[in-house]
């Protein structure tokens, strides 16, 4: 927060959940916000296009600038307080502060210490059981047969099945979106 004190223009690298949360909060506080992301719409890997476009429109109405299907090629310091961002598209923007909201990585250290099977996340079966059948896992640290599941939709999809399984009625996860 202290880094924001004398800043006006904030560039956010990442158009996912965290990037959009930053954009929402900072634009609400009056900052000039630019979001740079690889997606065609915000949160592309998490929500369908119509919802993503609605989110984009709502944040645009607050002044958020979107630089989608783009990335930072180079950051060039300018004055003491700002930098010019050179994007892969050739566009340039100036920012007083750059926030990185990319690169989720699950923390699996406790699961490793417990001797559980780890891949990109904590491996679970169709019941959300780990390699120890008495330990279940849920959240952005989980890896199912479909791969790592870092987003909200797969977590919500798993909750009802996990709850039933924990209560003794082993219920497979109906479908785990990727």
Model-derived regions: residue spans:
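Feature captures the FAD/FMN-dependent oxidoreductase FAD-binding
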Residues: 74-81
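Short, composition-biased local secondary-structure segments
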Residues: 22-31, 83-86, 163-165
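Rossmann-like dinucleotide-binding cores of NAD(P)H-dependent redox enzymes
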Residues: 9-11, 17-74, 155, 171-178
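Rossmann-like nucleotide/phosphate-binding core characteristic of flavoprotein oxidoreductases
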Residues: 102, 161-178
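FAD-site-proximal beta/loop scaffold in flavoenzymes
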Residues: 1-5, 81-86, 91-164
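Conserved strand-loop elements at the edges of beta-sheets that form or border functional pockets
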Residues: 77, 130, 173
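Residue-level signal for alpha-helix termini/capping positions
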Residues: 4-5, 12, 77
């Amino acid at each position: 927060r202290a880094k924001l004190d004398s800043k006006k223009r904030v560039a956010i690298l990442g158009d996912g959940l965290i990037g959009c949360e930053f954009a929402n909060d900072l634009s609400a506080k009056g900052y000039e916000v630019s979001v740079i992301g690889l997606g065609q719409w915000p949160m592309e890997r998490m929500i369908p296009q119509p919802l993503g476009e609605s989110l984009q429109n709502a944040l645009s109405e607050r002044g958020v600038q979107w630089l989608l299907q783009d990335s930072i090629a180079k950051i060039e310091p300018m004055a003491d307080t700002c930098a010019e961002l050179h994007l892969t598209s050739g566009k340039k923007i100036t920012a007083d502060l750059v926030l990185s909201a990319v690169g989720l990585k699950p923390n699996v250290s406790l699961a490793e210490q417990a001797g559980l099977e780890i891949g990109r996340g904590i491996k679970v079966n169709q019941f959300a059981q780990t390699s120890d059948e008495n330990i279940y896992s849920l959240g952005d640290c989980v890896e199912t047969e479909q791969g790592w599941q870092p987003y909200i939709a797969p977590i919500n999809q798993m909750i009802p099945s996990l709850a039933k399984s924990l209560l003794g009625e082993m219920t497979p996860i109906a479908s785990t979106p990727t």
